[in-house]
Regions:
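An N-cap/entry alpha-helix motif that binds or orients negatively charged groups
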Residues: 1-75, 180, 184-241, 377-379, ...
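A gly/proline- and charged-residue-enriched helix-loop-helix capping module
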Residues: 107-128, 132-146
Length: 394
C-alpha cells in the first residue's frame, strides 16, 4: 500500500517553496542569518537572476527514455552532480543539523562538505554514512590550527579538503546587524520576540540553544563556551594569507585539495600551476564582497583558464535542476548547494534535506529528457546560449 506524502512534502515542490516554508518556520533573525548577503545584496540576487539569462536549446529527437545523472569526482562515484556545500551553524536550524544533512547526502549517494563553523566536530560527522565527506578550512593566523584541522580530517577519513579563500575578512551583513544577530547568537529584543512567535522551532530547539558552539574550535578539556570559542574563531581570520600558505597546505594534505572562492581566471591558472586539485567558482553566496559577479557569469572564463586540467565546480544561486544542467553545459563538473540544505533542515530535518536533494534529481532528469540528453557527459556548450556570457544567438 502506497502512503500519501506528508503535507509539508506536497507543499515543498520547489526550492523556492522550501525557502518560503523555512521563512515561515524560523525566527526572522535565524532565517536572515542564512538568507542574507552583504550590504545591498546585489551579488546575492545576481547569483540567481544570472541563470535566467542562460537559455537551453533542446534536441528532442535524440531519444532519451533513460537518464543517467551519475558522475565520478576525485575517484568517487556520486549519484548526481549536486553536493551539499558548507554552511556554519546548521545546528541552529534543526537539532544536530550537520549530521542530519550528512546522513541525507549519504542516503542520496552524494557528497557532503562540513563547514569549519559547524556545531558538530570533524570526528562526529565522520560517523554519518559512507558517502564522500569533504572538510572546509581557512588559512588562520595560527597556521598550526590550519594544520591541526587538516590532520584531524585526514585521521577521520575525509576525502577532500576545501580551502575557502574569500573569507579573510567578515562581510558586512546588514540583515544580521538590523536583527541584532551576532556570533555567538544574540537576537536583540525584536529577535527574542520573533523567537517566541515560532513555537514549534522554539520547542524543538529548547535543549539545543544553550549548547550551540563551534565544535571544531573547542580545545580538549575546555568548556564549550560559545563566546570564548567564537571570539577565538573571529580572531583567527587572516587578511595576510597568500599563495605561500596555499603551498604549505598542499604539503600537509595529500588528498584532493580544492580552492573555494575563485572568480578570477588568473587565480585559477595559478592554482592549477601550484598543484591544486579542483576549483569552486564562488562568491560566498553573496555574503562577502557585494559587487562581485555572479558565479555562473564567470564560470566560462574559469573553465577556459583551467583547460580541463582539474575539475571546476560552482556554487551560488543554484535553485533548480535546470541551473545545474546549465552550469554543467558551461563546463562545471558539479554544483554545490548550501542555503537549500538549511531550508530543508528548518522544515523537516534529515527528511527535509533528503527531499531537497530529490527535487534537484527529479528536475535535472526532467530537463535533460526534454533537451534530449541521456548522460552528464553529453552536456556541452551547444546546449546553451546567452547574451551575457558569450553573445551567441540560437
Amino acid at each position: 500500500m502506497t502512503h500519501p506524502a506528508p503535507a509539508w512534502m506536497r507543499r515543498a515542490n520547489s526550492i523556492a517553496a522550501m525557502r518560503a516554508m523555512a521563512r515561515a518556520a524560523l525566527p526572522r533573525a535565524v532565517f536572515d542569518f542564512a538568507d542574507g548577503g552583504a550590504e545591498d545584496e546585489h551579488t546575492l540576487r545576481r547569483n540567481e537572476t544570472a541563470f535566467a539569462t542562460i537559455e537551453l536549446l533542446p534536441r528532442p529527437l535524440n531519444g532519451t527514455s533513460e537518464r543517467d545523472l551519475s558522475i565520478t569526482l576525485f575517484g568517487r562515484q556520486l549519484s548526481m552532480p549536486v553536493i551539499i556545500g558548507p554552511t556554519g551553524l546548521a545546528g541552529l536550524f534543526w537539532p544536530d543539523g550537520e549530521r542530519c544533512a550528512a546522513r541525507a547526502a549519504s542516503a542520496s549517494g552524494t557528497a557532503y562538505c562540513l563547514s569549519h563553523g559547524s556545531v558538530c566536530t570533524i570526528e562526529q560527522l565522520a560517523e554519518c554514512g559512507a558517502a564522500p565527506r569533504w572538510m572546509q578550512v581557512f588559512i588562520y593566523k595560527d597556521r598550526g590550527f590550519t594544520r591541526e584541522l587538516a590532520e584531524r580530517a585526514a585521521k577521520s577519513g575525509y576525502d577532500a579538503l576545501v580551502l575557502t579563500v574569500d573569507n579573510q575578512l567578515t562581510g558586512n551583513r546588514e540583515r544580521d546587524i538590523r536583527n541584532g544577530f551576532s556570533i555567538p547568537p544574540q537576537f536583540g529584543l525584536a529577535g527574542l520576540a520573533g523567537m517566541a512567535l515560532k513555537a514549534e522551532w522554539l520547542w524543538r530547539m529548547r535543549r539545543e540553544i544553550g549548547r550551540i558552539t563551534f565544535g571544531n574550535y573547542v580545545r580538549p578539556g575546555e568548556a564549550s563556551d560559545i563566546k570564548l570559542v567564537a571570539g577565538r574563531m573571529a580572531a583567527m581570520l587572516d587578511p595576510t594569507m597568500s599563495w605561500s600558505d596555499v603551498d604549505e597546505l598542499r604539503k600537509i594534505w595529500t588528498g584532493p585539495l580544492l580552492l573555494k572562492g575563485i572568480l578570477h581566471p588568473m587565480e585559477a591558472k595559478t592554482a592549477v600551476e601550484r598543484g591544486i586539485d579542483g576549483l569552486i567558482v564562488s562568491n560566498h553566496g553573496g555574503r562577502q564582497l557585494d559587487g562581485a559577479p555572479a558565479s555562473i557569469a564567470v564560470l566560462p572564463s574559469i573553465v577556459e583558464a583551467v583547460a580541463g586540467r582539474v575539475p571546476v565546480l560552482l556554487d551560488g544561486g543554484v535553485r533548480r535542476g535546470s541551473d545545474v544542467v546549465k552550469a554543467l553545459a558551461l563546463g562545471a563538473q558539479a554544483c554545490l548547494v548550501a542555503r537549500p540544505q538549511l531550508w530543508g533542515l528548518a522544515i523537516a530535518g534529515e527528511a527535509g534535506v533528503a527531499h531537497m536533494l530529490e527535487l534537484y534529481r527529479q528536475e535535472m532528469s526532467r530537463v535533460m529528457g526534454l533537451c534530449g540528453i541521456a548522460r552528464i557527459d553529453d552536456l556541452g556548450k551547444d546546449l546553451v546560449f546567452t547574451h551575457s556570457i558569450d553573445g551567441r544567438q540560437p
